[in-house]
């Protein structure tokens, strides 16, 4: 079983290393990290390359999260750890996305893949926190605010709904919430100071 856990961890982590924004911009003979905020994430990509091309980024980042959770679940389900397997895959793919060894440990902030793993762990809660993101974004125009509120609430809602059903997925949910909020610490500081930049997620971008 130890080897199975190690295999699940490695698969999920290295899937997380495949950063959609970096890959798609590389296909365009460019690097999203050399533009704007320098972040390898969806928001910076949209600002500079547009919403149309961002669909490929979304497909990659959501796809890798789904694959990681499913692979981990399938590997560990023979041992009776189906839900724990999904949670392990969720944790490792987000760690791979935010701290990718193949990209010098400089990845994205994990919100897109984070919403996806939330859906994989519990689709009802995933949809709810995605709704929180949408409401916050459309009311304020701040992607970061929606990201912090939605990701920050996931772990606590998951713990409340699934309390008593197993500690590992609950711990993973709380860890993911804390990690993604921490990845947005600079955004939180700018929000408090009134310096955060609003983002049009339907923008055509600045680079043609």
Where are these regions (language model features)?
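C-terminal ends of transmembrane helices
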Residues: 21-25, 96-106, 133-140, 185-189
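Helix-coil boundary and interhelical linker segments in multi-pass alpha-helical membrane proteins
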Residues: 1-7, 69-88, 119-125, 159-172
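Short, non-helical or kinked segments that cap or interrupt transmembrane helices
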Residues: 31-42, 102-115, 142-150
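Interfacial segments of multi-pass membrane proteins
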Residues: 44-51, 72-75, 92, 96, ...
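A cytosolic-side transmembrane-helix exit/cap motif
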Residues: 105-109, 130-134, 167-173, 190-196
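Cytosolic, membrane-interface loops and tails of multi-pass inner-membrane proteins
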Residues: 22-54, 189-208
């Amino acid at each position: 079983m130890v080897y199975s856990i190690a295999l699940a961890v490695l698969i999920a982590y290295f899937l997380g290393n495949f950063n959609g924004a970096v890959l798609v911009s590389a296909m365009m003979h460019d690097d999203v990290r050399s533009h704007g905020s320098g972040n390898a994430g969806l928001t910076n990509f949209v600002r500079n390359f547009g919403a149309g091309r961002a669909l490929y980024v979304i497909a990659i980042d959501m796809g890798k999260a789904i694959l990681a959770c499913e692979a981990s679940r399938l590997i560990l389900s023979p041992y009776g750890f189906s839900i724990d397997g999904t949670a392990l895959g969720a944790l490792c793919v987000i760690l791979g996305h935010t701290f990718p060894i193949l990209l010098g440990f400089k990845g994205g902030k994990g919100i897109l893949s984070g919403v996806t793993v939330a859906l994989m762990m519990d689709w009802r809660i995933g949809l709810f926190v995605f709704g929180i993101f949408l409401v916050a974004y459309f009311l304020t125009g701040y992607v970061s605010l929606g990201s912090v509120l939605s990701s920050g609430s996931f772990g606590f809602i998951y713990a409340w709904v699934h309390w008593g059903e197993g500690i590992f997925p609950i711990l993973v949910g709380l860890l993911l919430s804390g990690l993604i909020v921490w990845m947005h610490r600079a955004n939180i500081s700018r929000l408090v100071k009134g310096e955060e930049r609003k983002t049009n997620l339907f923008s055509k971008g600045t680079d043609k």
